[in-house]
């Protein structure tokens, strides 16, 4: 295996995980903050807000998992070799 391709694959895998974590991390922090504010304003709607928050957090986390899958594919099932 070409060492240049191996090195580029490792760097690309690191970038895939790192960059795919930035957006969902910021989004999850914003969503959680807004949910806390909403619950503070309307405590009786806590159950509905929490359910919606957990569902949206799961969708956001899926983006990070996609980045991890791409990184694992680059590391272990490298299509460029």
UniProtKB/Swiss-Prot annotation:
Gene3D superfamilies: F1F0 ATP synthase subunit C
Highest taxon above the source species: Eukaryota
Annotated site location: Reversibly protonated during proton transport: 61
The encoding gene: atpH
Protein task: F(1)F(0) ATP synthase produces ATP from ADP in the presence of a proton or sodium gradient. F-type ATPases consist of two structural domains, F(1) containing the extramembraneous catalytic core and F(0) containing the membrane proton channel, linked together by a central stalk and a peripheral stalk. During catalysis, ATP synthesis in the catalytic domain of F(1) is coupled via a rotary mechanism of the central stalk subunits to proton translocation. Key component of the F(0) channel; it plays a direct role in translocation across the membrane. A homomeric c-ring of between 10-14 subunits forms the central stalk rotor element with the F(1) delta and epsilon subunits.
Protein name: ATP synthase subunit c, chloroplastic
Segments crossing the lipid bilayer: 3-23, 57-77
Family: Belongs to the ATPase C chain family.
Disulfide feature: none
Species annotation: Chara vulgaris (Common stonewort)
């Amino acid at each position: 295996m070409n060492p240049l391709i191996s090195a580029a694959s490792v760097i690309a895998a690191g970038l895939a995980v790192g960059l795919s974590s930035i957006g969902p991390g910021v989004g999850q922090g914003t969503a959680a903050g807004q949910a806390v504010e909403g619950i503070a304003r309307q405590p009786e709607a806590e159950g509905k807000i929490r359910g919606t928050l957990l569902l949206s957090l799961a969708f956001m986390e899926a983006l990070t998992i996609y980045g991890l899958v791409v990184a694992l594919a680059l590391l272990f099932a490298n299509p460029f070799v």
